Design a protein with these regions (language model features):
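S-adenosyl-L-methionine
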Residues: 56-102
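Conserved alpha-helix/loop element of class I SAM-dependent methyltransferases that forms part
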Residues: 1-10
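Conserved small/polar residues in nucleotide/adenosyl-binding loops
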Residues: 104-106
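Short, well-ordered coil/turn elements that cap or connect secondary structure elements
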Residues: 8, 35, 85-87
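SAM cofactor-binding core of SAM-dependent methyltransferases
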Residues: 11-71
Length: 106
């Protein structure tokens, strides 16, 4: 992880567009390797269907032992904070970020 995170024990991440879940998956793997607590929030207006996400082979190419985690990232409920591991929590918001921001006057 970049030097700006040296000495940090916890990081909050905001991702705009969950998409295939690759960024979330890579961040999860780093959190486990580095022992760093990550609170990961992602907004997605158009989630991919299970038919598509089940065909993604990122775990097989990157971390075969974590295939079940990749599946969990896609299967966990939207709009609920989920502890994927003791070091990684995920909040997937099925929402239009532009509408959300307008509601809080940003």
């Amino acid at each position: 992880m970049p030097g700006i995170f040296i000495g940090k024990k916890e990081i909050n991440v905001l991702e705009i567009g969950f998409g295939t879940g690759l960024n979330t998956f890579l961040t999860f793997l780093e959190s486990q390797e580095k022992g760093l607590r990550i609170n990961y929030t992602t907004f997605e207006l158009y989630p991919l269907s299970p038919d598509i996400t089940e065909k993604l082979n990122y775990p097989a190419l990157i971390a075969p032992s974590s295939e079940s985690i990749f599946a969990l990232l896609h299967q966990c409920e939207w709009n609920q904070k989920i502890a994927i591991s003791p070091l990684f929590t995920l909040y997937k918001s099925h929402a239009d970020l532009t509408r959300t921001l307008s509601l809080i006057h940003i």
